[in-house]
């Protein structure tokens, strides 16, 4: 569906992420920033996006807090309404070092202090914001019904493409990072005869490349590249025997919520 005709939307995207750049998506204007949206560059990516958005926007929605360290300065020259979805508790992630965690905690504090509206995606994060900062937030939880679609005759073709049979395999889907317990899952399946289909960005990091090299040759493990086709994901989710969720940090994970909608048994870390 297209964005509302009553509201003009501008979305800022990383110019580093797309070989082909569209100017519009479902009625929204797309603008590109020549920086990565993740890692250290995300701070400057957020700052530049915010400055550009200020010129013609009445309301600005910020997703994540890494660039919010800039907000005290921003508030000196702009009173535009800021809505900030803080996502998860980035400063608690194991992958960050001490100084990065301190920076992210400070940036989170600035986000909540200088925002007009704070959005949280689950009750736990909402309670954290209230207890830590004494500020109320708007709870907007993830839905999962958007993943259901009519696959028609594609079910058989999808399973054959990935050498899978209905309800004989387990499925995992995540960013390939150590804190998602990727290696633990792969090691466990490599020592069994159970079939695993694991969808992720295996070539975006040294860790992912190493996992691909170590476990990619296992006869019972399928390491699949990222899949964005909802029909293909629908088949893989609805036909799996179990769903595995190894995340150990972060906020509500959309892929978990989506998987729950299919009613399959879920093995989740530390739950």
List each language-model region with its residue ranges.
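N-terminal strand-loop element at the rim of the active site
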Residues: 2-38, 124-132, 201-204
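An aromatic- and histidine-rich active-site surface loop
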Residues: 41-54, 59-87, 251
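Membrane-proximal helix-turn-helix segments that form the acceptor-binding/catalytic region
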Residues: 51-55, 76, 100-118
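Donor nucleotide-sugar binding/catalytic pocket of nucleotide-sugar-dependent glycosyltransferases
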Residues: 81-84, 108-153, 164-167, 172, ...
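Conserved donor-binding/catalytic core segment of Leloir-type glycosyltransferases
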Residues: 159-180, 186-199
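Nucleotide-activated donor-binding/catalytic signature segment of Leloir-type glycosyltransferases, i.e.
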Residues: 200, 209-230
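Aromatic "clamp/platform" in nucleotide-sugar-dependent glycosyltransferases that forms part
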Residues: 248
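Short hydrophobic beta-strand element within catalytic cores of glycosyltransferases
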Residues: 265-268
């Amino acid at each position: 569906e297209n964005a509302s005709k009553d509201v003009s939307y501008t979305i800022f995207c990383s110019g580093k992420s797309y070989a082909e750049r569209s100017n519009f998506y479902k009625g929204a204007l797309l603008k590109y920033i020549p920086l990565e949206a993740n890692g250290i560059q995300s701070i400057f990516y957020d700052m530049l996006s915010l400055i550009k958005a200020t010129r013609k926007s009445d309301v600005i929605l910020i997703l994540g807090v890494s660039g919010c360290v800039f907000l005290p300065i921003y508030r000196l020259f702009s009173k535009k309404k800021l809505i900030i979805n803080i996502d998860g508790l980035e400063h608690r992630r194991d992958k960050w070092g001490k100084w990065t965690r301190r920076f992210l905690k400070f940036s989170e504090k600035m986000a909540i202090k200088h925002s007009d509206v704070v959005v949280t995606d689950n009750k736990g994060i909402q309670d954290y914001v209230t207890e830590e900062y004494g500020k109320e937030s708007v709870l907007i939880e993830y839905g999962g019904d958007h993943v259901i679609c009519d696959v028609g005759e594609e079910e058989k073709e999808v399973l054959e493409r990935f050498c899978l049979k209905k309800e004989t395999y387990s499925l995992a889907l995540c960013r390939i990072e150590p804190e998602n317990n990727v290696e633990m899952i792969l090691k466990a399946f490599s020592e069994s005869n159970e079939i695993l289909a694991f969808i992720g960005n295996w070539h975006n990091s040294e860790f992912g490349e190493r996992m691909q090299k170590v476990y990619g040759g296992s006869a019972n493990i399928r390491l699949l590249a990222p899949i964005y086709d909802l029909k293909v994901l629908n088949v893989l989710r609805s036909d799996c025997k179990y769903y595995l969720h190894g995340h150990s940090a972060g906020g509500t994970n959309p892929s978990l919520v989506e998987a729950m909608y299919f009613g399959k048994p879920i093995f989740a870390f530390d739950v």
